[in-house]
Design a protein with these regions (language model features):
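Surface-exposed flexible segments
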Residues: 50-60, 90-94, 153-155
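Short, solvent-exposed loop/turn motifs
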Residues: 51-53, 85-86, 148-149
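Polar/acidic, low-complexity leader/linker segments enriched in S/T/G and N/D
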Residues: 1-71, 182-190, 199
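Short, charged/polar surface micro-motifs in flexible loops or helix N-caps
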Residues: 44-46, 83-85, 114-116
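Residue microenvironments linked to proteolytic maturation
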Residues: 5-15, 76, 88, 94-187
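Short conserved beta-strand and strand-loop elements enriched in small hydrophobics
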Residues: 65-67, 71-87, 133
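Compositionally biased, intrinsically disordered/low-complexity regions enriched for serine, proline
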Residues: 52-53, 79, 162
Length: 200
């Protein structure tokens, strides 16, 4: 019987991810104060903290399907992890803007939205809170050699922001947003100083 399956992950090992921002996203950060977070969203083939294992081929299939939602700007996630298979738009905090496989790991990039839940998420990140990510999906499980294996009927619903991920190294990290904003502020100060000197 299909059931709601929720998995928790830290987003980046040590809280630091490689620079995954495009030039357009960096410009959006500078011009619109946008915020992006990146990291590991899920992992296939390993036993997680919930004692479940997602076969890699199932994860690859679901990432391929989910990438269509990403392309259509419909890959939304909530702040916290509800016990529902339906995304509540009132609680949406972020939108997945990129997703890909890196070996057995599902990697992704999320844009923090200007919703009430997104503002809470932004405040947490700005305060240095280490946030995790959790997958939410529907599917059956079976017991095999002492492990709980997710079966082929699994359907990925979304990725939610959580405080306690169940899989190591599924913590999200700020994708240069703060660094880019600090560089813009410094550049603006220099430009203002030069303008002030030239006017005098």
């Amino acid at each position: 019987m299909a059931q709601l399956l929720r998995e928790f992950y830290e987003l980046c090992e040590g809280g630091v991810c490689q620079d995954l921002l495009t030039e357009a996203e960096k410009r959006e950060i500078r011009e619109n104060n946008a915020m992006f977070i990146t990291g590991k969203l899920q992992e296939g083939g390993v036993l997680n903290g919930n004692q479940r294992m997602y076969p890699p081929d199932i994860m690859e299939r679901e990432v391929k399907k989910y990438s269509e939602m990403v392309k259509d700007n419909r890959a939304l996630g909530e702040l916290d992890h509800p016990e529902s298979s339906i995304i509540n738009l009132a609680n949406v905090s972020h939108m997945v803007v990129d997703i890909w496989m890196d070996g057995p790991a599902v990697m992704g990039k999320c844009k923090v939205l200007a919703t009430p839940a997104g503002q809470i998420l932004r405040s947490l990140v700005d305060a240095g809170v280490k946030i995790g990510i959790s997958s939410r999906g529907m599917g059956s499980v079976k017991e095999h050699q002492g492990q709980t294996i997710v079966e082929d009927d699994f359907q990925l619903i979304c990725f939610d922001i959580v405080s306690e991920p169940s899989t190591p190294n599924a913590f999200m990290a700020l994708s240069e947003s703060k660094l880019v904003n600090e560089q813009v502020e410094k550049s603006n100060k220099i430009i203002n100083l030069i303008d002030s000197i030239l006017r005098d």
